[in-house]
From Swiss-Prot:
The keyword Aminoacyl-tRNA synthetase does not apply. GO terms for biological process: cap-dependent translational initiation; formation of cytoplasmic translation initiation complex; regulation of translational initiation. This is Eukaryotic translation initiation factor 3 subunit D-2. mRNA cap-binding component of the eukaryotic translation initiation factor 3 (eIF-3) complex, which is involved in protein synthesis of a specialized repertoire of mRNAs and, together with other initiation factors, stimulates binding of mRNA and methionyl-tRNAi to the 40S ribosome. The eIF-3 complex specifically targets and initiates translation of a subset of mRNAs involved in cell proliferation. In the eIF-3 complex, eif3d specifically recognizes and binds the 7-methylguanosine cap of a subset of mRNAs. Component of the eukaryotic translation initiation factor 3 (eIF-3) complex. The eIF-3 complex interacts with pix. Transmembrane segments: none annotated.
Length: 557
């Protein structure tokens, strides 16, 4: 037995009292560190080349490709002479044509070579498609080209950041919300067959339009002058004519700018508010004292409205003040001003005259409309000038001005380059950026019964100078035709007004507020106390940070 090697029995642990492994610890067992909290899947590998990201790409795809080299098998001898044939679908280049399409062929050669190199690099990173034909193989059109196209699309299709606008008035805790109406509901309303309003009282004095202003163009521009005239714009309750008419006529009383704001509310983005006093069966729609209701907005409906920059001449507050002053000066400069110039006087004088104050040329019409169901609207409308037609008839005008401040910052067309040759492009740009303002001007002209709506184009003398301006041209429209051109449905406008009036007439007597939500396309109706806007209860409520366009100007220009 000594000639054979000894046989030693191995020790086997036997569990005599149970089923399963014994209590002895595991020794010499292959082990790789891991964490029980890790998700089952692909462990991050920072040693592989950086791969191009692609939308909806499988995050576990490269686990089974050749790029996961942690557990890959390498054999350097047998595969040393192995080379992968390029499997890309190479499009054959067109034969060279002498002196023809030379730039196209040169670009074709350059782009083709660039795409080939790019695809090879991407393929090597995605499972070795460029070197081993793994799971990251190129598709029909080339993986690199698709990736580059996808990245470009995401780069230029980023959504603009949402800007939080400030409310026109701070909603207090003691205000009771009555109703919230979103714009899609308002856009479905309609009230057809509203007849032209009937004149009740006409008052004021109008000056004649200077026809020489129609000849102004870019090459023959005219400086905008500062006209020291005052336009008093009292509210509905402060109007003595409306007070007199309310005793015998109508049950809804307002001004043309208030009605236009309600009719065009679905086009507005900035916040605004209107105060309503209900007394018995009568409604008085009015604006708050010292509010910025009469200020004009600039680029309100643009894709990129002006930024809130304190102290900047291109902030919404500064542009609003600039546009309001331009509109006032322009409406007076295009008229024949002088003691000897002819004037058209209405039946009654201006009810807002003040001794020692020169008033602007303006005429008022107090008109009434039948809205059905014994509802009569009485409103104060206005004209800015008058013109005698070739036939000798008087035509009443509504004169407004559009202003250019910085075409690059506003993402608009350059007026000095396009106004004479492509005036339609300029107007289309303004309709896109100032849709609400133009719609309200059109509604005011339609309500007043103006024969023409004259629009002036006023630009800065220098884009960095907001104090000096020039007139570059004028354009005139018939209000009804212009409403159709800008897609303004008057039946829907009357329907919106009637809907809001019906809601208010159902409420008990008191004071109410209609407010456009600053950040949502909806209007809100509140029941407010009688002293909601008194000076004693208004301390700390409305500041320059609470309302847009505050501390810009006083109501009087």
């Amino acid at each position: 037995m000594s000639q054979y090697a000894p046989f030693v029995k191995p020790y086997i642990e036997y569990n005599e009292f149970g089923w399963g492994p014994s209590d002895l610890p595991d020794l010499e067992v292959p082990y790789q560190p891991f964490c029980k909290g890790d998700r089952l899947g692909k462990i991050s590998d920072w040693t592989t080349p950086v791969q191009e990201r692609k939308y909806n790409n499988n995050k576990y795809m490269s686990t089974f490709g050749s790029s996961n080299s942690q557990y890959a098998y390498f054999h350097g001898n047998d595969d040393a002479s192995f080379h992968l044939v390029n499997g890309n679908n190479m499009r054959a280049l067109k034969p060279y044509q002498r002196n023809r399409y030379r730039p196209t062929q040169r670009n074709n050669l350059r782009l083709h070579g660039r795409n080939g190199r790019f695809n090879a690099a991407i393929g090597a990173g995605h499972g070795g498609a460029g070197a081993a034909g793994g799971a990251g193989a190129s598709n029909k059109y080339g993986k690199g080209r698709d990736m580059r196209r996808g990245q470009t699309g995401r780069r230029f299709m980023r959504a603009a950041p949402v800007r939080q606008r400030q409310s026109s008035v701070v909603v207090r805790s003691d205000w009771v919300s009555i109703e919230e109406i979103d714009f899609p509901r308002l856009l479905k309303l309609t009230l057809p067959n509203i007849q032209e309003g009937a004149d009740l009282i006409t008052c004021g004095t109008l000056e004649f339009f200077d026809k020489q202003c129609d000849r102004i163009n870019v090459k023959n521009e005219r400086p905008l002058q500062k006209i020291d005239r005052i336009i008093n714009v009292p509210g509905t309750i402060d109007d003595p004519i409306i007070r007199r008419l309310s005793k015998s006529l109508g049950n809804v009383f307002a001004t043309d700018d208030i009605i236009a704001t309600l009719m065009c509310c679905t086009r507005s983005n900035y916040s605004w508010d209107i105060v309503i006093d209900k007394v018995g069966t009568k409604l008085f729609l009015d604006k708050r004292d010292n509010a910025q209701f009469d200020m004009l907005t600039v680029n309100e409906t643009a894709l990129e409205p002006p930024l809130e920059e304190e102290g900047s001449i291109n902030s919404p507050q500064s542009l609003s003040l600039e546009a309001t002053i331009i509109n006032h000066n322009f409406s007076q400069q295009v008229l024949k001003i002088g003691e000897l110039e002819p004037k058209h006087k209405f039946d009654e004088p201006n009810p807002f005259e003040e001794p020692g104050v020169e008033l602007a040329s303006i005429g008022y019409r107090y008109k009434q409309w039948q809205l059905g169901d014994d509802m009569v609207l009485v409103a104060r409308c206005k004209h800015n000038g008058v013109l005698r037609s070739p036939g000798g008839e008087l035509q009443f005008l509504s004169i407004r001005a559009l202003n250019e401040w910085d075409s690059k910052a506003a993402n608009s067309v350059e007026w000095r380059q396009k106004l004479d040759s492509q005036r339609g492009a300029v107007l289309a740009s303004e309709l896109r950026n100032n849709a609400c303002k133009l719609a309200k001007w059109t509604v005011e002209a339609v309500l007043a019964g103006s024969d023409q709506l004259k629009l002036g184009y006023v630009s800065r003398l220098n884009r960095k100078d907001h104090l000096h301006h020039v007139i570059l041209g004028m354009q005139q429209f018939k209000p009804q035709e212009f409403a159709t051109q800008i897609n303004l449905n008057m039946d829907n406008a009357w329907g919106v007004l009637r809907c809001l009036v019906d809601i208010m007439l159902k409420q008990p007597d008191g004071k109410y507020l209609i407010m456009k939500d600053p950040n949502k396309p909806m209007i809100r109706l509140y029941d407010i106390p009688e002293n909601a806007f008194d000076s004693d209860n208004n301390d700390g409520e409305e500041t320059s940070d609470d309302r847009p366009f505050l501390n810009s100007k006083d109501n009087k220009l």
